């Protein structure tokens, strides 16, 4: 697979990463998880050159890192492990639909304890990228970021990054310690970061990690109606997936499919290739627990979109419905 680096100073990774969240959390929770398949998907990812594996302590809650750790046992040197801190579970079933209820926690003492817990769960002595999951509105970002910087100084993290932040917040963090990456929702139907965050990151050599790069499966053509969403799936609670909005948004998926058919690729590959084309250090992290979807996603690294293809995709209208 083609490679790039996480920003100008970060580690080398494949241009397509892997988000591990869905192996333990959030999507299709009524279906039992098959850990052996998830482990094999991680191994398959490494074989395909998908080396950036993204998780978080709160996913599961607190089981996704363990799964990633088991999958990478004996393969640690082949992977670039990215995990996150800054959210904590306060009730495993207290959220909507019985989902975990989580809230931000950016207190430095929480970060200091959390990195050690993450390393234990992951079975490693360091993570390659330690990310602030969300900024805690009750804690100055300088204090939280300083605690992440301590993890670097202690050799527990090689690099640190941010998630879902504004340019102002990036600047405040940069004044304390270099920012290697910013993770944001970014796809053909969520393009907010193009206004300010993406240009700033490119100007300052910061990598951008788009999560939900396939619009939570929608851009890949996985479903065309609300009723096709699995029961106990968090997408059933999101505005864009409500039936009226979903029907209005089908034109977006259709346009992606038209480009895919024209160039002999899949819709998922087109959506991911569009993201890779947005900058030299943009590394999408699509999530999957299915071998065939992983292979499909990895194949996006070989898809070259022409200027005409990019223009057609850029012209796709904004979606109907808010993100949350």
Predicted regions and their residues:
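Beta/alpha (TIM)-barrel catalytic core signal, keyed to glycine-rich beta->alpha loops juxtaposed to Asp/Glu
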Residues: 3, 135-137, 141-324
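Active-site groove signature of glycoside hydrolases
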Residues: 119-136
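Structural motif
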Residues: 44, 48, 121-122, 155, ...
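N-terminal binding-site loop/beta-alpha segment at the start of enzyme catalytic domains
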Residues: 1-80, 231, 322
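Short, acidic/polar
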Residues: 31-45, 104-122, 166-170
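Conserved beta-strand positions
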Residues: 18-20, 55, 129-132, 162, ...
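N-terminal small/glycine-rich loop or linker at the start of catalytic domains
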Residues: 9-30, 82-102, 126, 131
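Alpha-helix N-cap and loop-to-helix initiation/capping positions
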Residues: 30-37, 63, 67, 99-110, ...
């Amino acid at each position: 697979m083609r490679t790039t680096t996480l920003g100008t100073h970060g580690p080398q990774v494949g241009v397509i990463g892997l988000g591990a969240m869905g192996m333990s959390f959030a999507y299709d929770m009524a279906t039992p998880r098959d850990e052996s398949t998830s482990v094999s998907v991680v191994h398959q990812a490494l074989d395909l050159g998908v080396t950036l594996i993204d998780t978080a302590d709160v996913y599961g809650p607190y089981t996704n890192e363990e799964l990633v750790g088991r999958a990478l046992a004996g393969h640690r040197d082949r992977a670039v492990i990215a995990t996150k801190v800054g959210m904590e579970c306060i009730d495993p079933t207290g959220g909507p639909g019985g989902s975990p209820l989580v809230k931000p926690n950016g207190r430095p003492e929480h970060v200091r304890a959390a990195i050690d817990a993450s390393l234990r769960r992951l079975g490693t002595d360091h993570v390659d990228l330690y990310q602030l999951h969300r900024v805690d509105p009750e804690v100055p970002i300088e204090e939280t970021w300083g605690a992440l910087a301590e993890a670097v100084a202690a050799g527990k993290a090689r690099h640190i990054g941010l998630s879902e932040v504004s340019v102002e917040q990036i600047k405040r963090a940069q004044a304390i310690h270099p920012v290697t990456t910013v993770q944001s929702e970014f796809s053909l139907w969520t393009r907010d970061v193009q206004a300010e965050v993406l240009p700033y990151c490119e100007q300052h050599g910061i990598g951008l990690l788009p999560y939900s790069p396939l619009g939570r499966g929608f851009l890949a053509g996985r479903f065309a109606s609300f009723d096709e969403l699995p029961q106990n799936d968090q997408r059933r609670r999101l505005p864009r997936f409500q039936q009226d909005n979903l029907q209005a948004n089908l034109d977006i998926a259709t346009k992606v499919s038209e480009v895919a058919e024209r160039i002999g690729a899949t819709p998922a590959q087109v959506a991911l290739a569009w993201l890779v084309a947005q900058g030299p250090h943009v590394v999408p992290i699509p999530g999957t627990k299915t071998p065939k979807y992983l292979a499909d996603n990895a194949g996006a690294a070989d898809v070259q979109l022409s200027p005409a293809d990019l223009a057609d995709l850029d012209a796709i209208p904004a979606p109907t419905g808010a993100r949350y």
